[in-house]
Amino acid sequence: MAEGRIIKALSGFYYVQSDNQQFVCKGRGLFRNKKITPLVGDYVEFEPKDDNEGYIMEIKERSNELVRPPIANIDQAIIVSSAVDPDFTTLLLDRFLVLIESKHIQPIILITKVDLLNEDQLENIKLYKQHYEKIGYRVELVSSKNQDLLPELEPYFDEKVSVFAGQSGVGKSSLINVLDPSLLLETAEISKSLGRGKHTTRHVELMKIGNGLVADTPGFSVLEFREIEAEELADSFPEFNARMHLCKFRGCMHDKEPKCAVKEAVENEEIAVFRYNHYLRFLEEIQTRKPRY
């Protein structure tokens, strides 16, 4: 039995990297019977059939996993937001952050296309950068067309498995192409009617960049909090986490309760109003969602 890691999944075949060799594998029927799907990023045991084929026999325990995109054992998520075309939106960025935080994955925020901004727009983006850095997030402003800005990003990938996430058309593929031009990933054109990119990435694949592995994932059209309960939502807002123990009532939802430390922090401008408003919006969404059967 050999061991390796799934680096690509395509049409029911799993490409397993084992040392310096790659095997094209199928999953055992047992996985289907147990409704277990091998994921890109999985560590597996497999039985080689010949020089480059085999069968996956066992999937090792996962440290974490995402459903959309379907990937496991991630060290960090690089959330890409464009400054313009499509326009920067903190609401969408916060949706990504909540989902990533709920999986206990380290987020990094990249805001792309800053070279397309005028001076006032750039100052506005820098203010948002300060807000997120105050929370504790790492934020970088980059242009995917300016290669001089990207070498400083390479240390982020060192010895880590990173997942790129973000609305389609924000520049994920362009960024990866600058980091490693040999990959030649197709870049998205922006739909003028929708204000978002057409999907260009059709499958999840781990690609070697420097000393790390990076997944360029399919663009998202829907971001839902299906796996997050209302009482868990505040845990995905780090600036709330630091104050929740000061709320008068245990189980405080930071909404209508009196003597709430989070609401006091908003009033004292210690927590950004836009972040709190997003929390309330997400909370209502979770509380009013239809049950799944």
UniProtKB/Swiss-Prot annotation:
Main location: cytoplasm
Entry keyword set: Cytoplasm, GTP-binding, Hydrolase, Metal-binding, Nucleotide-binding, Ribosome biogenesis, RNA-binding, rRNA-binding, Zinc
InterPro entries linked: G_CP_dom (IPR030378), NA-bd_OB-fold (IPR012340), P-loop_NTPase (IPR027417), Ribosome_biogen_GTPase_RsgA (IPR004881), RsgA_GTPase_dom (IPR010914), RsgA_N (IPR031944)
A Pfam family this chain is assigned to: RsgA_GTPase
Subcellular location: Cytoplasm
GO molecular function terms listed in the Swiss-Prot or TrEMBL record: GTP binding; GTPase activity; metal ion binding; rRNA binding
PANTHER family: SMALL RIBOSOMAL SUBUNIT BIOGENESIS GTPASE RSGA, SMALL RIBOSOMAL SUBUNIT BIOGENESIS GTPASE RSGA 1, MITOCHONDRIAL-RELATED
CDD domains given in the database record: S1_YloQ_GTPase, YjeQ_EngC
Enzyme class: hydrolase
Binding site for Zn(2+): C247, C252, H254, C260
Domain CP-type G, chain residue ranges per copy: 63-223
Organism, as annotated: Oceanobacillus iheyensis (strain DSM 14371 / CIP 107618 / JCM 11309 / KCTC 3954 / HTE831)
GO cellular component: cytoplasm
Positions bound to GTP: T112, K113, V114, D115, G166, Q167, S168, G169, V170, G171, K172, S173, S174
SUPFAM superfamilies given in the database record: Nucleic acid-binding proteins, P-loop containing nucleoside triphosphate hydrolases
Domain of life, per lineage: Bacteria
The protein's name: Small ribosomal subunit biogenesis GTPase RsgA 2
Membership in a protein family: Belongs to the TRAFAC class YlqF/YawG GTPase family. RsgA subfamily.
Role noted for this protein: One of several proteins that assist in the late maturation steps of the functional core of the 30S ribosomal subunit. Helps release RbfA from mature subunits. May play a role in the assembly of ribosomal proteins into the subunit. Circularly permuted GTPase that catalyzes slow GTP hydrolysis, GTPase activity is stimulated by the 30S ribosomal subunit.
